[in-house]
């Protein structure tokens, strides 16, 4: 079934002037698209999702996969996960079913977490930062939070961190792992 969700949306991404009230019919119609442009959110099962810019490629190339899978944009992918996934594994399964087409002429990655404490970072990459200049060749890579006792994380620290940088090992070839 479909989950009840809370999400946040930046209306500027829909072309609205956030310094003015929504009065015109055109602006009101644009607001109807807001549920399909979330930047983060949580659902009633405890699944939370967030989307973060990654600026991949020499001139920031958007992910633009073109296989036989159905197409989704970055924010509608997040909406789909919030509406239909109850946990991290279900969110990853949803992401694997679709070709991603990033919006706003940039690239993104996602963090998903669920009520059990499991989390994952979903990234679409192709090679290294020096070679990742063709968004159509990117593939989904999933990095799960390491909950093992041999994790480099402190014993009582069960967090996973995301920034605006790709975390896929070896992506930034000039940087040490």
Model region roles, listed by residue range:
Residues 1-41, 45-47, 51-83, 89, ...:
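C-terminal, well-structured catalytic/ligand-binding subdomain of enzymes
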Residues 100-107:
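Short arginine-rich
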Residues 88-99:
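Short, well-structured alpha-helical segments that form the helix of a local strand-helix-strand
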């Amino acid at each position: 079934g479909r989950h009840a969700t809370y999400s946040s949306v930046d209306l500027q991404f829909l072309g609205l002037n956030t310094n003015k009230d929504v009065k015109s019919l055109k602006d009101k119609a644009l607001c109807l698209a807001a549920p399909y442009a979330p930047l983060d959110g949580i659902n009633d099962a405890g699944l939370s999702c967030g989307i973060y810019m990654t600026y991949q490629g020499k001139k920031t190339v958007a992910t633009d996969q073109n296989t036989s899978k159905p197409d989704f944009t970055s924010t509608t992918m997040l909406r789909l996960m919030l509406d239909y996934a109850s946990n991290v594994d279900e969110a990853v399964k949803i992401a694997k079913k679709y070709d991603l087409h990033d919006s706003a002429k940039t690239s993104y990655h996602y963090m998903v977490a669920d009520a059990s404490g499991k989390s994952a970072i979903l990234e679409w990459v192709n090679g290294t930062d020096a070679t990742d200049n063709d968004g159509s060749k990117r593939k989904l890579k999933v990095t799960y939070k390491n909950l093992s006792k041999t994790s480099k994380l402190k014993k009582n620290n069960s967090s996973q961190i995301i920034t605006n940088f790709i975390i896929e090992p070896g992506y930034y070839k000039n940087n040490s792992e």
